[in-house]
Swiss-Prot record:
This is Myosin-binding protein 7. The chain crosses the membrane at residues 458-477. Residues 310-320 have a biased composition (Polar residues). Residues 399-431 form a coiled coil. It comes from Arabidopsis thaliana (Mouse-ear cress). Residues 276-350 are annotated as: Disordered. The modification Phosphoserine is found at S385. Membrane-anchored myosin receptors that define a distinct, plant-specific transport vesicle compartment.
């Protein structure tokens, strides 16, 4: 509002206050001042252009208010307005800070939830992968178990067929079914016999033994089982009683006079055997192990008499047994007791191998050639017992005789080849030994001392004495050349006469002189 009043320049201006406004109190009449206030009041009432909420002026009191009070009131109003504005700004800042804090907290919560969600998803994937792998592993184990169960069932079936084959084979040797079952029960009740089977190992030869059939042909049951089942499933999975049974049968097939010791090992041994004429229908496997010291035997209990079958076939018509005494066999047993277990094992193995060779000589012909062959084999270290010779099969068929003659030739070739290989190995060993001795001798010999070469000078090589000798020898040679050529009366030690009489060329060493010029 404009309250300033222009006064004359001759008057001094008297200011109403110290605020720096242009209003002045000097020269202003009260009438003009009231008119200006009325005009402002009318404008305020009519147009409402200037409205102050805190200022509630009473119309009756307007005339009484002085101008100083109005200015102070306006100043207070402005200051209060500024203070309220400042308070509003402070509240706005507080609200803004609270909103930003809430937003940051909400954002951190969102981030934390996202992180937890990612961790849960990762754990879920890990557990899912672990569960899948575990399911695959369990499924693979189930498949492996099913395969093992199938193989075990096949092995059990093969062993069942094998046991039936052994049972029929033992029955073909004359045993009854009751004896087979009794022996099976005895083997199952005595595990110590199974452990003793592995105490002795015989040295294997360079060549495996030849398998052949003597008097019988393999039956269809044995052929089918051996080819289809037994060889398909090895005996590593078979129980110990069946392996022991197979070992006993194999030993009985290889050596018909095989005896099984019974009773105490340290005390006197009593032997019993069932002598079977001929070989088994089929050599399925060749074992180099025998068992000793067993309380139970595959071939029966303790007896001092042995049973012999008839000489025709294991399955004879009468089926009767002949009991007979065997004094030579008892003497052989006493000799075996003196030598010990190791000699028994070695003799059984060697007798088995020679039995295959010498049975041909005894059965085909009883001439002196067979006796000479038997003596040669015995001299080489392979002996046969008299019982083995007496129990050889009677080969009357010419085809079988030819086959066994060929077998004899093959065995002879085999032995000769074995001897040749052994001699070659011996010669090779001797050659290696000689080479080693030569190497040691060459190392032990002291090397010859080499004398240093002396460089001869020209003056020393062609001295006066050597020249004089050369001239003298030349003169005497010319004088000898002018002698008479008639040699009558010449002494007997003349060199020329000896050359004529001996008619042998004589070569005289000529001394070659190098040139004196350098």
């Amino acid at each position: 509002m404009d309250l300033a009043i222009v006064s004359s320049p001759t008057r001094d201006v008297v200011r109403c206050c110290d605020c720096g406004c242009d209003c002045s109190l000097n020269g202003a009449s009260p009438g003009s001042l009231l008119r200006s206030v009325k005009r402002k009041y009318e404008e305020f009432e009519n147009e409402k252009l200037f409205h102050i909420p805190e200022l509630e002026l009473d119309l009756s009191s307007n005339a009484k208010v002085q101008i100083e009070n109005e200015l102070e009131l306006l100043r207070e109003t402005v200051s209060s307005q500024q203070q309220s504005i400042q308070d509003l700004y402070e509240e706005l800042d507080e609200e803004r800070n609270a909103a930003s804090t809430a937003a940051s907290e909400a954002m951190s919560m969102i981030l934390r939830l996202q992180r937890d969600k990612a961790e849960l998803q990762m754990e879920l994937r890990q557990f899912k992968r672990f569960a899948e792998e575990k399911m695959e592993h369990d499924q693979q184990e189930l498949l492996d178990l099913e395969d093992l169960i199938y193989k075990r069932e096949q092995t059990i079936q093969a062993l069942t067929f094998e046991a039936q084959a052994y049972k029929h084979r033992m029955m073909s040797f004359g045993f009854t079914e009751a004896e087979v079952e009794t022996e099976k029960n005895m083997l199952s009740r005595n595990p110590s016999m199974i452990e003793n089977d592995y105490q002795y190992d015989l040295p294997t030869s360079d060549y495996p033994p030849i398998k052949c059939n003597v008097n019988e042909n393999p039956g269809p049951l044995e052929a089918d089982i051996d080819v289809d089942d037994v060889e398909k499933y090895p005996l590593a999975d078979s129980p110990h009683p069946l392996k022991t049974l197979e070992r006993r049968i194999s030993q009985m097939e290889r050596n018909p006079s095989f005896t099984q010791p019974t009773g105490d090992v340290s005390g006197g041994r009593h032997y019993t055997e069932k002598n079977v004429v001929g070989q088994s229908p089929r050599h399925q496997r060749h074992f180099r192990r025998v068992s000793t010291g067993s309380a139970s035997s595959l071939l029966g209990t303790t007896r001092e008499k042995r049973l012999d079958f008839s000489n025709d076939s294991p399955r004879s018509n009468n089926g009767s047994f002949r009991k007979m005494e065997d004094p030579p066999y008892a003497a052989g047993n006493s000799f075996a007791r003196d030598k010990g277990d190791s000699s028994e094992i070695g003799d059984n193995d060697m007798n088995d191998r020679v039995y295959t060779i010498d049975s041909v000589h005894h059965s085909v012909s009883h001439s002196g050639t067979a006796e000479q062959k038997f003596k040669n084999d015995t001299a080489d270290g392979y002996a046969m017992s008299p019982r083995e010779i007496s129990n050889q099969p009677d080969l009357g068929d010419p085809e079988i005789s030819k086959l066994y003659m060929r077998l004899q030739a093959l065995e002879a070739d085999r032995e000769s080849m074995r001897q040749a290989i052994m001699s070659m190995r011996t010669e090779k060993a001797q050659m290696v030994l000689l080479k080693e001795i030569a190497q040691h001798l060459s190392k032990d010999v002291v090397p010859e001392r080499r004398l240093p070469l002396r460089k001869t000078s020209i003056i020393g090589a062609f001295n006066f004495i050597s020249v004089f000798k050369w001239i003298t020898s030349f003169v005497f040679w010319r004088r000898k050349a002018r002698r008479s050529k008639y040699m009558n009366g010449v002494q007997g030690n003349n060199m020329g006469l000896q050359m004529l009489l001996e008619k042998t060329p004589r070569i005289r060493q000529w001394r070659c002189l190098s040139s004196t010029q350098v």
